[in-house]
């Protein structure tokens, strides 16, 4: 490949590619840093979800997995559990993937990401300034609590 050249890969069927990226682990593990209070989203092995400021906590290492375009599941690598939003807006970690474990991932204009529940479509993953999760019905666009910056969690 010559310096300055660009290589393109087929992405659409008419270009010789598939219609969508295959589901799977296509990203390196991440830490999700919340703008509100400076906490990292943490998934505990017992199913609890909260935020912690300690960068070395092993339970903040998360695997984001694409399920379809714009939709991800978030798995705690150490906890081996999936982030889920329940019907009352609580965040918890499930041992298996359910329809409550899928979130619309969106890059906002301020370069932070938001994670909105696919099942409860007006509710977001959010952390309060105390590090506790915020109930889904109390979240909405424009809140700092819903803004997350994905950071590398490579060892």
From Swiss-Prot:
Chain residues that bind heparin: 36
Propeptide: 1-9
Crosslinked residue numbers (Glycyl lysine isopeptide (Lys-Gly) (interchain with G-Cter in SUMO1)): 95
Gene3D superfamilies: 2.80.10.50
Biological process terms in GO annotation: branching involved in ureteric bud morphogenesis; canonical Wnt signaling pathway; cell migration involved in sprouting angiogenesis; cerebellar granule cell precursor proliferation; chondroblast differentiation; corticotropin hormone secreting cell differentiation; endothelial cell proliferation; ERK1 and ERK2 cascade
Chain positions of motif Cell attachment site: 46-48, 88-90
Region (Heparin-binding): 128-144
Location of the protein in the cell: Secreted; Nucleus
MF-aspect GO terms: chemoattractant activity; chemokine binding; cytokine activity; fibroblast growth factor receptor binding; growth factor activity; heparin binding; identical protein binding; integrin binding
Keyword tags: Angiogenesis, Developmental protein, Differentiation, Growth factor, Heparin-binding, Isopeptide bond, Mitogen, Nucleus, Phosphoprotein, Secreted, Ubl conjugation
Coarse class of the protein's main subcellular location: secreted
Positions of the record's site feature: Important for interaction with integrin: 128-129, 134
Keyword Metal-binding attributed: no
Top-level taxon: Eukaryota
Record's comment on post-translational modification: Phosphorylation at Tyr-82 regulates FGF2 unconventional secretion.
Stored SUPFAM superfamilies: Cytokine
GO cellular component term, pick one: nucleus
Annotated coiled-coil segments of the chain: none
Reported function: Acts as a ligand for FGFR1, FGFR2, FGFR3 and FGFR4. Also acts as an integrin ligand which is required for FGF2 signaling. Binds to integrin ITGAV:ITGB3. Plays an important role in the regulation of cell survival, cell division, cell differentiation and cell migration. Functions as a potent mitogen in vitro. Can induce angiogenesis. Mediates phosphorylation of ERK1/2 and thereby promotes retinal lens fiber differentiation.
Family as reported in the entry's similarity comment: Belongs to the heparin-binding growth factors family.
Assembly with partners or alone: Monomer. Homodimer. Interacts with FGFR1, FGFR2, FGFR3 and FGFR4. Affinity between fibroblast growth factors (FGFs) and their receptors is increased by heparan sulfate glycosaminoglycans that function as coreceptors. Interacts with CSPG4, FGFBP1 and TEC. Found in a complex with FGFBP1, FGF1 and FGF2. Interacts with FGFBP3. Interacts with integrin ITGAV:ITGB3; the interaction is required for FGF2 signaling. Interacts with SNORC (via the extracellular domain). Interacts with glypican GPC3.
Name assigned to this protein: Fibroblast growth factor 2
Originating species: Ovis aries
